[in-house]
Regions:
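Polytopic alpha-helical membrane proteins, predominantly small-molecule transporters/carriers
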Residues: 1-343
Length: 343
């Protein structure tokens, strides 16, 4: 029962994340770089900080979390910086490959490598931990089934694109470049997977038994998002300078509206990793699901993103065959969340 509760919590977080771009559509008169970094203040700084504070028991301070973990803190933040690069390059993969192919390659790489790289790199730096033992047959099978589900959804996306007219195709992917797009999508997926590697290096940054299991991942989450914030801030402030958009922050007439929706978008985005931490607190009896939790989150992100696509009629006009392939992909991803536990 606890495992079902844990998976449900992770699913709720994934649903919230898939909804985070809805509030962004309500932002007025700000450039991308301006609203992106402001929502990032909430998503990557404020909310993760308060989340990390939940791991601090009474009588202890926030900074005590990091005592004796200097190397782990540095590595966790480093992989957060690299994850930030993944977020920025993700959009480029869709520019050169289209949404279906770009998302499939990038998210598939993120889910797969994000799950596997953590134990591999931990084994290099801390061989005494025997981290590779967590990569069991069930874990590898879960990753493979997740990749299969994402690939099937990618096929559905390609079928949808094939049904468009030539003019619509050019409008959809006017800069199509497979070699360049493939390289960028693989880079985006690899870098995005660094989030889970950062969590692996920060796995011990808490107060042991004094921190409830459901909060133990939150300090590491804060360090990863802090690293990602640094990457995004550098890029966004560069774009503010390049595009002369610093004046966005001085538009007092839209500040209230934009701050509200940036905060909402940031809260919805952070919900996925807050939910991941809470959910893992209920999965402690299943080492397989603990290892696969990030992969499960990515799979459910894809599921709910496509469910939103159906609700918002993004698949309107597609053939029944295309919709059938899409639904099969969604079902495979849902199965991937439970299959390892059944073996």
């Amino acid at each position: 029962m606890e495992i079902l509760i844990g998976l449900l919590i992770i699913a709720i977080g994934a649903f919230c994340q898939s909804s985070c771009y809805v509030p962004i559509n309500k932002i007025k008169d700000w450039s991308w770089e301006s609203y992106w970094i402001v929502q990032g203040v909430f998503a990557w700084l404020i909310l993760p900080f308060f989340g990390a504070m939940l791991a601090v028991p009474s009588g202890h301070s926030f900074f005590e979390l990091f005592d004796g973990y200097g190397f782990n803190v540095a590595m966790t933040m480093l992989f957060g910086v690299l994850w930030g690069v993944g977020g920025l390059t993700f959009g480029l993969s869709m520019r050169y490959l289209g949404v279906a192919l770009g998302q499939s390659i990038a998210l598939g790489t993120c889910a797969g490598l994000g799950t596997i790289m953590g134990p591999v790199l931990l084994n290099i730096f801390f061989p005494e931990m025997d981290a590779l033992s967590s990569l069991t047959f069930s874990v590898i099978l879960g990753v493979v089934v997740t990749l299969l589900g994402i690939a099937i959804i990618g096929v559905a996306g390609s079928m949808k694109a094939a049904s468009l007219s030539e003019e619509e195709k050019k409008a959809a992917v006017k800069d199509f470049n497979f070699p360049k797009g493939l390289a960028i999508a693989l880079l985006a997926g690899f870098m995005s997977g660094c989030f889970n590697v950062g969590l692996a290096f920060g796995d011990d940054i808490h107060f042991g038994t004094l921190t409830p299991d459901m909060y133990k991942t939150l300090p590491a989450t804060f360090l990863v998002t802090l690293g990602g914030f640094i990457t995004n801030a550098i890029y966004c402030f560069y774009q503010n300078t390049k595009n002369h958009t610093w004046g966005d922050y001085q538009k007092q007439e839209v500040w209230g509206n934009n701050l509200l929706f940036c905060a909402l978008a940031g809260a919805l985005w952070y919900s996925q990793f807050f939910g991941l931490s809470l959910g893992k607190g209920f999965l402690t009896e299943s080492p397989t699901l603990m290892t696969l939790s990030f992969c499960i989150l990515m799979a459910l992100n894809v599921v709910f993103s496509n469910v939103w696509g159906i609700i918002l009629k993004e698949w309107k006009g597609c053939s029944k065959k295309t919709i059938t392939v899409l639904i099969i992909g969604i079902i495979v991803l849902i199965i991937s969340s439970f299959l390892p536990q059944l073996i």
